[in-house]
Amino acid sequence: MKSFEPYLIRIEEALESVLPQPAKDARTAPVIESMRYSLLAGGKRIRPVMVLAFCQLCGGDPQQALPFACAVEMVHTYSLIHDDLPCMDDDDLRRGRPTNHKVYGEAMALLAGDGLLTKAFETALSFSGAPEDALRGARILAQCAGADGMVGGQCIDLDSEGKNVDLELLREMDQG
């Protein structure tokens, strides 16, 4: 991962700036804090690193792809927050510390996930390049995260609880 260190530094700085503190409105401070708790909890950041690395590999400027890299990480984090909820996998720990709903409560965790999902699209659409590229990227992200992608995979996961799961079903869950 050492060769990806410059990417990781850029990603962490960009993620930190996406959700500045203090919140603009004191009434929304709890949801911003909850969003930051999970988004800035560390992790390998494989997904956003891949976005920047592929951009560079294709001859692009990784700095320009940073909004998309951050958006991908925000969608991933939102999915983890929701996946940890009692109505899903009911996990108590994530990345070595209490899950979002254990710290902030279920309602705030749900809002934090929703907030990260919408912030992801706001961030992706802040891309400074050609507007059609931003729209194309946002559409791809929506398709991958939606009912035919990640959400669909979670649905299959819930439906298969307590059942024998074969390799084909695991592939369906993974691919949505």
List the predicted regions and their residue ranges:
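N-terminal amphipathic/basic leader segments beginning at the initiator methionine
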Residues: 1-23
